[in-house]
Amino acid sequence: RARRPSRSSPGFDPTAVRGTPPPDWKPGPVTGMRKACFRMQADGHNLEVTVIPAGGDLLANVNRWRGQLKLEPLDQQQLIDSSLDVKAGNLDGKYIVIPGASETILAAIFPEAGGGSWFVKLRGDSKIAELQQEAFRAFVSSLRFSPSFQ
């Protein structure tokens, strides 16, 4: 039975976002721009999931993350071809997998009407990230955001 999200769940800034993390994700520090943070370990590798409201468009952020993994940037059409539609509450967004040699980033980006976006990102060991894709997608779908840029 799925746990019901609580306004005071550890790992969340309750004024900004709430959701239901998988039971094996442990709350991490919620500071500064991080409105939610969770961590998990498997086979000696760490994964971190963060939820951050910020500016910048989808392509610029995806290419910044690709650069962190030492990958070449995508153009707009490549981004369209490699992203999937995703929904969290009443927000529509894009889901993308950025596989690096040893690390992978899973990300969901939800633009808001006021010009900003919510960025939900998992980063960690590629093998473990692959195993966490379904849990990450379920977490993303469970999220409910407070308006941050209106």
Predicted regions and their residues:
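Coil-to-beta-strand transition motifs
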Residues: 44-46, 102, 113-117
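Surface-exposed amphipathic alpha-helical segments
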Residues: 16-25, 68-69, 115-150
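N-terminal "mature-domain start" segment
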Residues: 1-35, 76-77, 144, 150
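Signature of long, low-cysteine stretches enriched in small and polar/charged residues
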Residues: 27, 33-35, 63-113
